[in-house]
UniProtKB/Swiss-Prot annotation:
Name the UniProt record assigns to this protein: Repetitive organellar protein
Domain notes: The leucine-histidine zipper domain contains 32 11-mer repeats divided by two 6-mer repeats into three blocks.
Keywords: Coiled coil, Host cell membrane, Host membrane, Membrane, Repeat, TPR repeat
Compartments where located: Host cell membrane
Region annotated Disordered, chain positions: 1-70, 1520-1547
Gene that encodes it: ROPE
Entry coiled-coil feature ranges: 88-644, 1041-1161, 1249-1410, 1472-1520
């Protein structure tokens, strides 16, 4: 669908245009703010029509008013569409710029990737990339924070929505209440009116007074009945109060029962305490065991310390060895010193001997001299005297000298002797020292050997000790593990006990919680009872009110009666006077009717009140039933709980009884055992077995029997036993009864005390809890009040600040408006407006910042104060609560201590009573000394039975424990639930407080943001207006100046570029060759480096392998030493084992010797007995008969021989024989008193017997001692054997471990040897490789030398080529000068054309003004004829001008492009020159120049193409003249049947192109937001049509448009207007006339609508044009009966309306904005041979046409030569991401375009056009009006900046001239304007098809446009359901972007 729109006429003055635009925009903005809905916009649009009547289109007199309103709506649509589409176009420009940047960055990326030389640069890039990654991570974190904030905001919005819903509910309730009040008021007024009427009627009516009186009496009776009814109700209420009191009593009983249960719980608590004490005792035992374990560990640590001390001793021994070795070395040094001293002494001796020889020689010389003198004297003949004297003197001297010599000889001899002696001594000392040294050395060697042996022995000993310690440690570890296991078991037991305790606690808690819940239920019931009481009171009050109302009504009735009586009295008097009774019957009938009506009203009132009373009764009964049901449920719960509690109590009591019985039996048994042991004279111990005790008792009984048989032979044992059994049974029964009675009494007393204490404790706890709750509630209320006060204060402060800031902002706005007005006045004069605006903006910004800072500071202070107050309140609350809790804990602790003291006193008393009973029992048991066998048997049987009973009860107790555990769990769950509820309430309070504070802050922030945005909008609008005006002035001035300069400079730049291109080609060829060589060199250098690196790596590997081999060897040696140590330790263990065996053998031998000695003693004893027996036999032969009798009596006795039996024989037999002998002797004494032999024998025998008895006793004691010793020795033997087995096992284990270690060591040695061999092989291989690498190095060096020589030759060739290029450059300069002269000639022609153009414009305006003032039809027809002729002339003049203008503009554009290319080439060359200077390596130069060459080749081609286009300009100018002549005859006229002429359609494409190109830059500068909005809409699959041109002629409403999704339309937009294009079939879905759409709409939740996405542009469109959509919807419903009366559709449409008002966004899937799809028209027949340009072809533009500044240029211009790398890398990665996004969008757009091409010719099933045609009276065929312009104007339209694809399409159009002549289809579509209709009976006619075909064959349209005309007849209502008649027809032409 296309919204066909008509622009208003343009004013002559530009100032008026701008002022009107500003007024319109300001008016629209005000309406957007003030009016929330479209109705206000529609109403305001009518007001604007009054101001624009002079500029509007002329209609007929009949339809003026409706059309004016309609067109003003259209104008508003146009303005709003312009605003939205401007923003969209700005966005598309930005996308294009980003795409261009991305392409250029890709190029530079490729260049930088090809370089890959500067490693430092790569490192920097890596660092930057890491930095960018970090920043990206930070950004992600920020995004997450933002998302969290958004979630919080959404939650807050949800909360606000809930609050809004609550407010709405409250409002609705309030409205309902108001309605009820209004109804009541209405009823009151009706009653008053009725009373007034009654008064009027009573005055006229007389006869019915008696009936009225009767009815009054009836009413009084009714009132009495009502009163009685009320009394009955009151009685019912009192009865209900009685039932409530009964329930209260029942609740009190329940409370009493709960208190009893509490007492039971306290009993359970006391039992728990006892169990805890037992548990504490068990813990103490465990702690003792742990202490024992710790002591064992300490012993182990002490042993470890001893071992360490031994190791230290061993180390000290080694140090001593080292000292001895050092002493030896010192002694050797001393020996050498002695030798040196001896040498010195010998040298001194030799010197002294030399001195002696010298002295001798001197003296000999002197003697000889003397002798010579003497001989000379003799020769002279000196006197003898003289000679004699002289001889004497000489002799004296000689003697003296001889004495001196002798002395000297003596001295020296002595010295020599001393020296010799010293030498001899030294030699002796030397020899001694040598001997001593040798001895010492031998001793030291021996000592060292001994020490080594000792060390080895010590090591072995230490190793053995270590092994022993290790064994001990292992044992201890095992013991440790066992202890740990025991600990774990004990811990498990403890945990189980803890769990049991916890279960009991949980049960306790559950019971407490149950009690609490029951208390809560009671409280709830009380509250409900109170509420019911309150309701009952309210009911009573209501009844009282009703009574009062009834009384009031009775009073009113009485008053009425009085009035009636008075009136009747008056009437009677009047009747007496008048006596006219003719009309009385009528009056009576009227009165009867009125009375009947009143009676009805009274009955209705009565029924109403009765219904109310019935409702109250029903409610009362329902509530009563509910309360009774609740009470019954509570009673059932209570009964169930009581049953459970009774069961628990019974089980606890049974458990206590069983425990008491078990303890009694155990104590009785223990006392029995003790008493038996004391009786038998045995030491009591707990470990005695029952069988042993039985044996001891039987032995004791036999002894007693023997003794008793000796004393009383006549009495028998059986009688004694029977008596004892009877006595024992009686005594035991009495004792048990007494014991049971006393225990029962004590238990009852204890229970009563415990219950009392529990009740006291519970009462105190309840009181404390209530107090605590009251205090907490008070604090909570205080806290809430404080919060409310703080919030109110905060709101007041915020409102004050907001008002202050609003006032200040208003003042600023006023000041700003004044200043802006002054600046505008100055701007009209043209004086410094920019500077003033900038200063004002700065001041305003500073002032706003100051205000914001103040506001922030004040809000921060308030928030801090609020927070501090809140913290103080919370702290006080927390302190108070803690104090209460501490008090509660202290009181509970005191109560617990008192309870424990009471329980302890009771327990002590109980123990004392039990002790007394035990003492009595012991005394009574002491009497029972006989009959132990049978008694013990009975006790054993009873014990078994008791044990079985206890086990059964224990099983029952386990079930009881499970029940208790379940109860504890329930209690814990209840406690957890209550704690969670408390926490949740605290959290809710905190959250509510935070939400309130946040809401206040958000409100204030929103207000501040709104004010700031409004102010910014005002400033930006003024700035934009100012910039637009300045830009227009500057552009007009600059274009004139720059055109001349650019044209002159363009030719010179072209020549310079050609020269540079050639130079660059040569350089690049040179650099390519050089770069190849250099790359080879670098490759070989890198290979050499790699080889060296490999050699170094291999050497390092070899070193590592050697080190590893050494390490392996060391490890092997260490392991060998360890093995030796292990062997030594094993030997030591064997020695210790042998010693232990020897010790054991010795002990065994000693014990065997002792046993032999004892056997000897026994044998001696037996010999003695045999002797004695022989003696007895010899003496007792006489009394054989007596002996037989005695023997028979003895044989009758039942004696067990196995009890007192030794190794030597039967002792009992000897004892019996002795007794026999005694009897025999007693008989013999009685009979033979006279015989003396018998006396002597008797006396002797008695003495012997006494001796024997003593010896037997001694021997018995010895035997017992020996038995004990034998047992001890046997135990020791067993222990020693166990030790021996353990040691043997350990020895075997050690041997196995040693064998395993030996095997492992052998394997390791084998593996290491194999590894060493492998490594040696690797080393040999590596050495070979090293030699090969060295050979390759030599080869590479030779190749490098050759390459250098080649490079020098290439440089020489390069210089020669440069000289040739300079010659060509000079030739090109001459050509440039000739072209300049030609350009100056063309300038003159352009000036003349401009003058002609201005004249034509003036004439055109005059014609338009004259046409607009005419109204009548006759004048219109005349004007049509005149305008046809004028228009032809205008078209001629315009075309003359436009052709020249287009050519001039093309020259300018081409010059701009050439200069732009030159600038880029210069900048790039400069940049690369600088980089070449920086990096003096051949490889970089070559790569850079190759890349430059590739780029410049592309640009050179473009430059050559531009030059070729310049040369074509001359030919185009010549062809324009023929085009003008052809255009004059190219107009088509369409004539109707009535003779009305249709407007002519003239193509003004040249002018349109000029307008597009002239104002493109202005469009982009003025409205940058336009493209942004277009791009945002394009993202949502929304496409826009730009109305580029519309004809000013009213009769010829021709509109030219272009789709703005085509990227090249940016260059051709000027005064365009944007139109939204929708798919016709989708209108049904948008209008909610489609099931699918409505189903989707109904699925969406209402709350979600407020969170849906919708672009702001689309939402504004819907809000503004909702009335249009509503009318369109009504039209569709009228056309299609399917959609009429569909409630779902209507309901969803109404909801949609409300959501558009409230919601900020909509769901994307709800509305579809798509490109327009053409219907399947008659043109499909001719489309087979027509090559339509596809949308995909439009989108496939080349990326070379998109040009932006390169990174290098940015680097130069921004002065970031050093910092450019960091900045540009960061920017590069951001732009890369944007580039990928652009590519994705391109793919999406291309896919859409393909779909559109596929579906282009498919028509939808439903369309408004078809329906309009169906409704119209006549259906005309679609006709075509094809207008052809010059073919060659297609060439002129081409812009030099178009891409290669457009050039290809133009070439195809040129080549297919013949096909175009055949296929006469064009892209022009004539659609009907909404008001375009024709009157009935009128039919539009066109030329015949034959004529049209002839015209089409002759001429083709320049635009290749299809002109599609929809002709409708009859008066049909438009889309707005308005009747319209209009003869003016509008055709919409889609402009092809290729022309």
């Amino acid at each position: 669908m296309i919204f066909n729109l008509k622009k208003s006429k343009k004013n002559e003055d530009g100032s008026n245009k701008d002022s009107k635009k500003t007024n319109e925009t300001s008016g629209i903005e005000k309406k957007e703010k003030s009016n929330k809905w479209y109705n206000k916009i529609v109403n305001n649009s009518t007001k604007k029509d009054k101001d624009k009547n002079n500029d509007s289109i002329v209609y007929d007199d009949e339809s003026k008013v409706g059309e004016n309103d309609h067109h003003m709506k259209e104008y508003e649509l146009e303005d709003q569409l312009k605003e939205t589409l401007k923003s969209i176009t700005a966005l598309s420009i930005k996308v294009k710029e980003y795409e261009v940047k991305i392409e250029e960055l890709e190029k530079e990326l490729k260049l930088e990737k090809e370089k890959q030389i500067n490693k430092e640069y790569e490192k920097e890039l890596n660092e930057k990339s890491e930095f960018i990654k970090r920043q990206m991570e930070l950004l992600k974190e920020k995004e997450l924070n933002i998302n969290l904030k958004e979630n919080k905001i959404n939650n807050k919005e949800i909360i606000t929505l809930k609050r809004e819903e609550k407010l709405n509910d409250i409002e609705s309730e309030y409205i309902e209440k108001n309605k009820e009040k209004e109804k009541l008021n209405y009823e009151v007024t009706n009653i008053k009116m009725s009373l007034d009427k009654l008064t009027c009627e009573v005055q006229e009516k007389k006869d019915n007074l008696e009936k009225i009186n009767k009815k009054v009496i009836e009413k009084e009776n009714n009132l009495r009945e009502l009163k009685e009814f009320m009394k009955e109700k009151n009685e019912i209420i009192e009865s209900l109060d009685g039932t409530i009191n009964d329930k209260k009593n029942a609740y009190e009983k329940l409370e009493i029962s709960f208190e009893e249960k509490r007492k039971m719980i306290e009993m359970l608590d006391s039992k728990l305490i006892e169990k805890e004490e037992n548990f504490a005792n068990k813990q103490a035992k465990l702690e003792k065991e742990n202490e024992i374990i710790i002591e064992k560990l300490k012993d182990i640590e002490s042993r470890e310390k001893d071992f360490k001390s031994k190791e230290e001793k061993f180390a000290s021994m080694e140090n001593e060895l080292n000292t001895l070795k050092s002493d030896l070395s010192k002694n050797a040094c001393q020996m050498e010193v002695y030798k040196l001293e001896i040498k010195d002494l010998s040298q001194s001796l030799v010197e002294k001997e030399r001195e002696i020889f010298e002295i001798k020689n001197e003296y000999d010389d002197k003697i000889n001299n003397m002798k010579e003198k003497l001989s000379s004297i003799n020769d002279k003949g000196i006197d003898n005297t003289v000679l004699h004297s002289e001889e004497e003197k000489i002799n004296k001297l000689l003697k003296e000298k001889e004495t001196e010599l002798n002395e000297i000889h003596k001295k020296y001899n002595l010295e020599i002797e001393t020296i010799k002696n010293e030498l001899n001594e030294k030699e002796e000392e030397l020899e001694k020292n040598k001997k001593a040294h040798t001895v010492e050395v031998t001793n030291l060697t021996k000592e060292i050997k001994l020490l080594e042996k000792k060390t080895e022995d010590a090591k072995e000993g230490h190793k053995n000790e270590l092994n022993e310690l290790n064994n001990q440690l292992s044992k201890l570890n095992k013991e440790k593990d066992n202890i740990k296991n025991e600990n774990t078991e004990l811990n498990d037991k403890i945990s189980s006990l803890n769990s049991e305790v916890n279960i009991l606690n949980k049960d306790k808690q559950t019971l407490g919680n149950d009690i609490k819940t029951l208390n809560d239920l009671i409280n709830n019931l009380k509250n409900e009872i109170n509420t019911s009481d309150n309701k009952m009171n309210k009911m009573k009050e209501d009844l009282a009110m009703l009574n009062e109302e009834m009384e009031g009504k009775c009073v009113v009735i009485d008053e009425i009666e009085k009035k009636y009586k008075n009136e009747i009295f008056m009437l009677e008097e009047k009747l007496k006077e008048k006596e006219n009774y003719a009309d009385l019957n009528d009056e009576i009938s009227i009165l009867r009717n009125s009375i009947y009506v009143k009676e009805k009203e009274f009955i209705e009132m009565k029924e109403f009140y009765e219904n109310k009373i019935n409702l109250f009764n029903k409610n009362f009964e329902e509530k009563k039933n509910i309360y009774e049901n609740e009470l019954n449920s509570l009673r059932l719960k209570y009964d169930n709980e009581q049953g459970l509690i009774k069961q628990i109590d019974e089980l606890n009591i049974q458990k206590l009884k069983t425990e008491e019985k078990y303890l009694q039996l155990y104590n009785d048994n223990m006392h029995m055992f003790r008493s038996i042991c004391t009786k038998i004279d045995m030491p009591y111990s707990e470990n005695i077995k029952g069988s042993d005790l039985v044996d001891f008792v039987t032995a004791y009984i036999k002894r007693r029997d023997e003794s008793s048989s000796d004393a009383n032979p006549d009495t028998t044992h059986k009688e004694m036993v029977a008596e004892l059994e009877k006595r024992h049974a009686a005594i035991v029964a009495e004792l048990e009864e007494k014991h049971k009675e006393e225990i029962a009494k004590l238990g009852e007393g204890h229970k009563e005390v415990v219950l009392r204490l529990g009740e006291q404790h519970k009462e105190e706890t309840i009181i404390l809890e209530e107090k605590h709750k009251d205090v907490v509630t008070k604090l909570g209320e205080q806290h809430k009040e404080n919060i409310i006060k703080l919030e109110e204060e905060h709101k007041d402060v915020v409102t004050k600040l907001g008002d202050q800031y609003k006032e200040e902002i208003a003042k600023l706005k006023e000041e700003h408006a004044v200043v802006v007005a002054e600046l505008e006045e100055k701007h009209k004069l043209g004086e410094g407006h920019k500077e003033m605006v900038d200063e004002l903006e700065k001041r305003h910004a500073d002032f706003v910042e100051g205000l914001e800072e103040k506001h922030k500071a004040e809000t921060a202070k308030l928030e801090e104060g609020h927070k501090s107050e809140m913290n103080e309140v919370e702290k006080r609350h927390a302190d108070f609560v803690e104090g209460l809790e501490e008090k509660h804990k202290a009181e509970t602790a005191k109560l617990g201590e008192g309870h424990r003291e009471v329980v302890a006193g009771l327990e002590e008393k109980h123990k004392e009573v039990v002790a007394e009973l035990e003492e009595k029992h012991k005394e009574e048991i002491a009497k029972l000394e006989e009959g132990h066998k049978e008694v013990m048997a009975e006790l054993g049987e009873k014990h078994k039975e008791v044990v079985a009973g206890l086990e059964a009860k224990h099983n029952l107790e386990e079930g009881h424990k499970e029940m208790v555990a379940e109860l504890e769990k329930r209690h814990a769950d209840l406690v957890a639930v209550l704690e969670e509820q408390h926490k949740a309430e605290i959290i809710k309070l905190g959250e509510e407080h935070k939400e309130v504070v946040a809401g206040i802050e958000e409100k204030y922030k929103v207000e501040a943001i709104k004010l700031a945005e409004e102010h910014k909008d005002v400033v930006t609008k003024l700035g934009e207006q100012h910039k637009e005006e300045i830009a227009k002035l500057e552009d007009g001035h600059k274009e004139v100046v720059n055109e001349v300069e650019k044209k002159n400079a363009s030719l010179l730049n072209m020549l310079e570029e050609n020269h540079k291109n050639e130079m660059i080609k040569l350089k690049e060829e040179h650099k390519e060759s050089a770069s190849d060589l250099v790359e080879k060199l670098y490759q070989k250098d890198e290979e050499v480096k790699n080889s060296n690196n490999k050699i170094e790596e291999l050497t390092n590997v070899i070193k590592d392998l050697n080190d590893s081999i050494m390490c392996y060897k060391k490890q092997i040696l260490e392991e060998v030493e360890k093995r030796n140590e292990y062997n030594e330790e094993i030997n030591k263990l064997k020695i210790v084992q042998n010693e232990m065996k020897d010790m054991n053998d010795k002990k065994i031998l000693e014990k065997e010797n002792e046993i032999k000695k004892l056997n000897k003693k026994l044998s001696n004893y037996k010999v003695f007995e045999t002797k004695e027996n022989t003696y007895k036999n010899s003496e007792m032969v006489v009394n054989e008969n007596k002996e037989r009798i005695i023997v028979d009596s003895v044989c009758k006795e039942n004696i067990s021989e196995s009890d007192v039996e030794g190794k030597g024989g039967n002792l009992k037999m000897t004892l019996s024989l002795k007794k026999k002998e005694r009897n025999i002797f007693s008989i013999n004494d009685n009979k033979n008193e006279s015989s003396e032999l018998v006396d002597t024998i008797k006396s002797a025998y008695i003495n012997k017997i006494e001796m024997y008895k003593k010896e037997i006793e001694d021997n018995g004691k010895n035997i017992e001692d020996l038995k004990n010793k034998i047992l001890d020795l046997s135990n020791e033997l067993i222990n020693l054997e166990n030790m021996k087995n353990v040691l043997t096992d350990e020895n075997n284990n050690l041997k196995k471990e040693i064998e395993i270690k030996d095997n492992k060591l052998n394997e390791k040695e084998k593996n290491e040897n194999t590894e060493i061999l492998n490594l040696n092989d690797d080393i040999i291989k590596l050495k070979k490789e090293i030699s090969e690498w060295k050979d390759e190095e030599e080869k590479l060096t030779k190749e490098n030398i050759k390459l250098k020589n080649d490079i020098e030759q290439i440089n020489k060739e390069y210089k020669i080529k440069e000289e040739n290029l300079m010659i060509k450059f000079n030739e090109n300069i001459n050509e440039v000068t000739s072209l300049k002269n030609q350009i100056e000639i063309e300038k003159m022609k352009l000036e003349e054309l401009n003058k002609n153009y201005e004249l034509l414009l003036a004439e055109k305006r005059e014609t338009n003004m004259s046409i607009s003032n005419d109204d009548n039809k006759i004048v219109e027809n005349n004007i049509l004829e005149d305008t046809d002729s004028k228009q032809n002339n205008l078209n001629k003049n315009v075309e003359d001008k436009t052709g020249d203008d287009i050519n001039c503009e093309k020259n300018n554009d081409q010059a701009k492009e050439i200069s732009y290319l030159k600038d880029e080439i210069k900048k790039i060359s400069m940049l690369y020159g600088e980089e070449l200077n920086r990096k003096n390596s051949y490889d970089e130069k070559v790569k850079n120049l190759t890349n430059e060459l590739k780029e410049l080749k592309i640009r050179n081609k473009k430059g050559e193409e531009a030059i070729a286009e310049l040369n074509k300009l001359k030919n185009i100018k010549e062809k324009n003249k023929s085009v003008k002549q052809n255009d004059e005859s190219s107009s088509n006229n369409i004539i109707t049947k009535d003779g009305d002429k249709t407007p002519e359609y003239v193509s003004n494409d040249d002018k349109i192109q000029k307008d597009w190109k002239a104002n493109l830059v202005l469009k982009l500068k003025e409205k940058p937001d336009l493209w942004d909005n277009i791009n945002s809409l394009e993202k949502e699959n929304f496409r826009v049509m730009s109305i580029v041109k519309e004809n000013k002629n009213v009769q010829n409403d021709k509109i030219v448009g272009i789709y703005s999704y085509f990227k090249k339309c940016e260059k051709e937009l000027k005064n365009d207007m944007l139109v939204i294009c929708l798919v016709l079939k989708d209108i049904l879905s948008i209008l909610f006339l489609n099931d699918n759409f409505v189903n989707l709409f109904e699925k969406i939740d209402k709350i979600l609508w407020k969170q849906m996405y919708i672009p702001t542009e689309i939402r504004i469109l819907f809000l503004r044009y909702f009335s249009f959509l509503d009318k369109l919807r009504n039209y569709v419903k009228c056309v299609n009966e399917e959609y009429v009366n569909n409630e779902r559709y209507e309901y969803s449409w109404a909801l949609f309306q409300t959501y558009l008002e409230t919601a900020s966004n909509l769901k994307k899937e709800m509305i579809y904005y798509v490109l327009e799809k053409a219907e399947k028209d008659s043109c499909e027949n001719n489309s087979s041979n027509f090559d339509k340009p596809k949308i995909t072809d439009i989108l496939n533009f080349s990326k070379d046409s998109i040009r932006l500044k390169t990174i290098a240029q940015l680097r130069k211009e921004l002065n970031f030569e050093r910092e450019a790398k960091n900045i540009l890398n960061y920017d590069y990665q951001i732009i890369l991401n944007k580039y990928h996004e652009c590519l994705r969008k391109l793919k999406i757009v291309k896919n859409m375009a393909r779909e559109l091409d596929f579906n282009y010719n498919v028509s939808s099933k439903f369309s408004i056009k078809k329906e309009l045609e169906m409704c119209s009276d006549e259906n005309d065929e679609f006709k075509y009006n094809n207008i052809k312009n010059n073919e060659e104007k297609n060439d002129t339209i081409k812009d030099p900046k178009h891409n290669n694809l457009i050039q290809k399409i133009i070439n195809l159009q040129r080549n297919k001239k013949t096909e175009k002549k055949k296929n006469n289809l064009v892209n022009e579509i004539n659609t009907m304007y909404p008001g375009d209709t024709t009157p009935k009976g009128k039919i539009f006619t066109t030329n015949d098809n034959s004529k049209q075909n002839e015209i089409l064959k002759k001429k083709d349209n320049i635009n290749n446009n299809i002109t599609h005309k929809n002709v409708y007849t009859g008066q049909v209502k438009n889309i707005f359901n308005e009747p319209v008649e209009r003869k003016v027809r509008i055709s919409f032409i889609h402009k092809s972007p290729f022309n």
